[in-house]
A protein has these predicted regions:
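Acyl-donor (CoA/ACP) binding surface of acyl/acetyltransferases
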Residues: 16-163
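A short helix-loop-beta-strand connector motif used in the catalytic cores of GNAT acetyltransferases and
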Residues: 2-18, 32
């Protein structure tokens, strides 16, 4: 499954994963990253060689239930990589009975994209994100200067299977 292809990476409150392309004839290959960069803001990036193959859509579809599960107000150990062997916020998460701190609850996820990154906007809308707002000249790109940003949001779905 998709969640089995993710490798846990948790630094200073971020919740990020490597995306691996698994091939029968070769070992895993990291092709991108996905995660909560500043929750509730999510983000993803891929090696340009893998653009246009549906990997971003597949990864985001797999990640969003994990995002809402992790940021549900429940114990972090319930969702934060039970198989990872490191400690997070001083709490061991590999089966320890120590009480983990609560993850904050977010009822939406937000993605920021440049107005010209139409393929990324298409990925977001395919997965269920909706346009929320346009922010003018709010991001400074070192090469392109001040840029406008489009904000897309996905709200926590109600119903079974969603924490």
């Amino acid at each position: 499954t998709f969640s089995n292809t993710l490798q846990c990476h948790n630094v200073a409150g971020n919740w990020n994963f490597a995306i691996e392309l698994l091939a029968e004839h070769a070992g895993p290959r990291v092709v991108g990253l996905i995660g909560a960069v500043r929750a509730p803001e999510i983000g993803y990036m891929f090696n340009a060689s893998y653009w246009g193959h549906g990997y971003a859509t597949e990864a985001l579809r797999g990640f969003m239930p994990l995002f809402f599960g992790h940021y549900s107000g429940r114990d972090i150990a319930d969702y934060a990589g039970r198989d990872c062997k490191e400690e997070r916020n001083g709490v061991r998460v590999n089966g320890s009975t120590a009480k983990a701190p609560l993850a904050p609850r977010y009822d939406y996820a937000e993605a920021h994209t440049d107005t010209e990154l139409v393929p990324s906007q298409n990925v977001l809308t395919k997965v269920g994100f909706k346009f929320h707002e346009k922010r003018e000249k709010d991001f400074e790109n070192p090469v392109l200067g001040l840029r406008d940003t489009l904000i897309f949001r996905m709200y926590r779905p109600a119903g079974e299977g969603w924490p």
